[in-house]
Amino acid sequence: RRSELAVTMWIAYHRLFDRAGEQSLVDHYRAVYAPNAPGFARMQVQLKALADYAKAHQIRLYLAMTPDVHNLVDYKFGFVHDTMRQIAQGDGYTYVDLLPAMQGRPPEELFAMPGDPHPNALGHQLMADAIFPVIK
């Protein structure tokens, strides 16, 4: 209950004081996944290190790409999926894109609670249904 209040307050604050709209979220993701972004470069190094370890120890790796569920009808973040697919394939991961399992659904169907885009039980079930055939 306390975490729901914190999330609700965080959402209310950001809706009032941040740049509004989907475009600000797209801009944020473009900045995060820019080739020269320090966090992006660190992520690539860590994914490669994990891949090298897995290869040395004969471990299969999977990268499941979870979509941003704010707008699954007119999805604006395909560039993130493309980037992560390229990295995964280059490093030897099996890539599983979860967007097709969720695309076209209204976000409210998948939100853990109003305004919180973390997946609810249905979202988790859709992801599991998409991942299971790949890993079995």
What are these language model-derived features?
Residues 1-86, 90-93, 98-104, 108-109:
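Serine-dependent acyl-ester chemistry module
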Residues 114-136:
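Histidine-centered active-site loop/cap adjacent to the catalytic His
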